[in-house]
């Protein structure tokens, strides 16, 4: 019953999955395998196929690093692999939200001027959905509000042992710099957010030539 409520609430507040048509077309079968990315693709597929073991279960040891931190240069397939995992699980009826970092924050901002759910409603969904996929973390505007909101979501999932997948063009130190508010230049919350993600996630690194330049 709790799972059905989560699905219903996420559809009402965020949409079916938050995924646009471009995300929905990205599957493992449409991923272009190369020598540079085949190990990353295999790791992503293993994660999707073994996802049930990533979820916290009553009476079972905490699942440990049950998320993925997918990093690499632009155009190397990070978003495709993250979306392929999401689509694999959605096809099995599992609740998943997959959004860019910018869209995730914009959805929260819309609650300030519309009746489409309150800020707390949206945050609750992001914190409790069985899998949250955040694409392009580090592309959001580096404001105090943005990093505070991102930390709130990541920390909520950390405390609940829920799996989270993020993709980024940056290594951890560059990401901390990108997420540090320009108003204060205080990196404490950005560093705490990335520290949480490093504790929650296994790393997958993509290399090679950008698909977009081929």
Regions found by a protein language model. Name each.
Residues 2-7:
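Short, small-residue-biased leader/transition segments that mark boundaries at the very start
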Residues 14-42:
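Dynamic helix-loop-helix/coil hinge segments at AAA+ ATPase domain boundaries and subdomain interfaces
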Residues 40-41, 90, 94-128:
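Short glycine-rich substrate-engagement loop in P-loop NTPases that contacts/grips substrate
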Residues 43-61:
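Pre-Walker A adenine-sensing motif
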Residues 58-81:
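Walker A/P-loop nucleotide-binding motif
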Residues 94-95, 128-131, 160-166:
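Loop/turn-to-beta-strand initiation segments
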């Amino acid at each position: 019953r709790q799972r059905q409520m989560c699905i219903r609430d996420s559809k009402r507040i965020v949409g079916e999955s938050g995924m646009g048509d471009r995300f929905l077309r990205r599957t493992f079968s449409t991923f272009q395998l190369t020598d540079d990315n085949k190990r990353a693709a295999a790791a992503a597929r293993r994660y999707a196929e073994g996802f049930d073991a990533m979820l916290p279960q009553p009476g079972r040891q905490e699942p440990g690093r049950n998320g993925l931190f997918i990093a690499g240069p632009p155009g190397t397939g990070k978003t495709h692999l993250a979306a392929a995992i999401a689509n694999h699980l959605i096809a099995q009826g599992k609740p998943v939200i997959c959004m860019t970092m910018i869209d995730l924050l914009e959805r929260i901002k819309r609650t300030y001027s519309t009746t489409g759910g309150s800020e707390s409603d949206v945050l609750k969904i992001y914190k409790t959905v069985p899998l949250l996929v955040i694409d392009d973390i580090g592309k959001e505007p580096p404001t105090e509000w943005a990093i505070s909101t991102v930390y709130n979501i990541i920390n909520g999932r950390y405390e609940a042992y829920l799996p989270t997948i993020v993709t980024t063009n940056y290594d951890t130190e560059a990401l901390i710099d990108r997420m540090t508010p320009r108003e204060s230049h205080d990196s404490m919350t950005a560093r705490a957010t990335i520290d949480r993600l490093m504790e929650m996630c296994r790393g997958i690194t993509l290399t090679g030539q950008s698909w977009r330049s081929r």
